[in-house]
A protein has these predicted regions:
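A short local loop/turn or secondary-structure capping micro-motif enriched for an aromatic residue
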Residues: 96-97, 137-138, 173-175, 201-203, ...
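Intrinsically disordered/low-complexity terminal segments and short unstructured peptides
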Residues: 16-17, 24, 59, 77, ...
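Loop-centered beta-sheet repeat module
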Residues: 174-221, 225-241
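Compositionally biased, intrinsically disordered low-complexity segments
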Residues: 18, 24-26, 181, 243, ...
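Outer membrane beta-barrel
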Residues: 64-196, 283-322
Length: 388
């Protein structure tokens, strides 16, 4: 073996991977690269949020202020066994949320939030997935978690096709069981609609904030409020119906979604019959540019691509199953986002949000009590990357 090849292999072993190392013949290396694909993506952001509607660990000095850094990195490995079979694994760093005066300990470490096999029956346009993956349903509000759901997914068509019908059954991280069905239909090149059903089930045990003998709240080492378990564990469900649409105009795209939790008691044991505002969620958004996905879609656009979005949201605390950090539970208000692709695979975006609490949200990370009607200003600056 040549000295350069030995050095390349040694470096790869020190880095924890041997994928793509050029220690074989040129023909063998080309064969591997044709089948193998690696992607590195992630976000580093700084947020300032006076009312903790943003998601991520904040200050741990019990001041109730919400500001700090948030970061995650993912490495996705795809191996095309042949034209019909694909193996995918994604390594997730977890979220490094370091607030002011808080050391970044990252106690959970990295983990695989995706690990699945996909088989495509191209003749019948059917696609089967077995393993750990996730999904984005509706227009990304009612369910948006692309990992940590282990089970089976069957779909007629792909999500980018004019017609796609998808069925999913699996167990989510944390013990929740999820069923979903979704039909997405394009009526023209500019218009598409979705009709979605999502059901989640879990064993839930009620909790109450922990207090000392004087009635003062007790906190964990990271500044979060301690909770005590009360009562027996019960099997609870969430059951969502959801409708959404996307319409492209000249230079502007409109997207909107409405969802409602049909359950009498949700997975947290909350009685929802008289909580119409808390069990429903909706948003409408107008954006310019090719995408409103600033974290994942914008980095892969041409350098110099600009995108701007204006969104009004009214999201009840129990009106969605799981969403990304661009939606805020129990809040209504305006969210503005501007982003630009600065390098190949690299973009930046800036967010301003003005949100009002729809209900009494209980205690925030540091014991701050959020009241109905409270307003919050949200500022976020993010660096997004996706390298292939």
């Amino acid at each position: 073996m040549k000295k350069s090849a030995k050095l390349s292999l040694a470096l790869a072993l020190m880095m924890g991977t041997t994928a793509g190392v050029q220690v074989m013949t040129n023909n063998a290396s080309a064969e591997v690269s044709d089948k193998f694909r690696m992607e590195l993506n992630g976000v580093s952001s700084y947020f300032h949020d006076t009312d903790k509607v943003y998601y991520g660990q904040t200050r741990t000095d019990n001041t109730g202020l919400g500001k700090g850094w948030n970061n995650y990195t993912r490495v996705q490995l795809t191996y095309n066994v042949d034209k019909d079979v694909q193996a995918v694994a994604r390594l997730h760093s977890n979220y490094d949320n370091a607030g002011d005066f808080a050391a970044n300990k990252n106690t959970s470490g990295a983990y695989f939030d995706q690990s699945y096999i996909k088989y495509s029956d191209r003749k019948n346009n059917l696609h089967y997935i077995v393993g750990k993956k996730g999904m984005t349903l509706g227009q990304s509000m009612v369910y948006n978690s692309t990992g940590n759901l282990t089970g089976v997914q069957v779909s007629y068509g792909n999500f980018w096709d004019p017609t796609c019908f998808q069925l999913t059954y699996g167990d989510a991280k944390g013990g929740n069981r999820v069923w979903s069905a979704q039909l997405t239909q394009a009526t023209s090149k500019a218009t598409s609609f979705n009709a979605t059903y999502v059901r989640g089930e879990t064993l839930y045990q009620k909790t109450t904030p922990a207090t000392d003998r004087n009635g003062n709240l007790q906190f964990n080492n990271d500044g979060t409020v301690k909770f005590n378990y009360t009562g027996e564990a019960k099997r609870e469900t969430d059951s969502f119906v959801d409708f959404g649409a996307k319409v492209k105009f000249h230079g502007v795209t409109m997207v909107g979604e409405w969802s409602r939790n049909q359950a009498n008691y949700n997975q947290k044991g909350k009685y929802l019959d008289k909580m119409a505002g808390e069990r429903q969620a909706w948003f409408i958004e107008f954006y310019t540019g090719p995408t409103n996905d600033f974290g994942s879609g914008l980095p892969v656009q041409k350098v110099g691509t600009h995108a701007f979005s204006v969104r009004w949201q009214d999201v009840g605390r129990y009106g969605t199953y799981v969403h990304n950090n661009t939606f805020y539970d129990g809040k209504k208000g305006l969210r503005l986002d501007y982003g630009v692709t600065v390098k190949k695979g690299l973009s930046v975006d800036f967010v301003y949000g003005r949100m009002q609490a729809k209900d009494k949200a209980g205690y925030g990370n540091s014991g701050y009590k959020i009241k109905k009607g409270d307003w919050s200003n949200i500022f976020v600056a993010a660096l997004n990357y996706k390298f292939r």
